[in-house]
């Protein structure tokens, strides 16, 4: 947790972020889908269905369903691992990278680091 932000402030940022995502005309992701997406994009290294299931402590079918939705939205894609054809790799996409940039912007705004902060300073 950031040293200068209380738990209440962080929950407020989360709420504002979720509300902004709900209001916008963009991908509508469940909490699990968002968790899988963020794990793939924020943790370095190759990701597999098996590894994501272990990291998130959910079943492989749950990861597969989340990846089905992320794939429909072109936020992630799956590819058979050429080194081990039993394993499926999860890959990032340009659209997923753009979504992550947007998400970071929304969170910056919600935390007061964006236009809101500039408006408050000008007032």
Show the residue positions of the predicted features.
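Amphipathic alpha-helical dimerization/coiled-coil segments
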Residues: 17, 21, 101-123
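Basic, amphipathic "hinge/linker" alpha-helix immediately C-terminal to the N-terminal HTH DNA-binding motif
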Residues: 82-103
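Canonical helix-turn-helix DNA-binding module
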Residues: 46-88
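N-terminal leader segment of winged-helix/HTH proteins
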Residues: 1-27, 123
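Generic structural signal for well-ordered, non-membrane alpha-helices
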Residues: 16, 35-38, 65-71
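N-terminal helix-turn-helix DNA-binding core of bacterial DNA-binding proteins
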Residues: 19-58
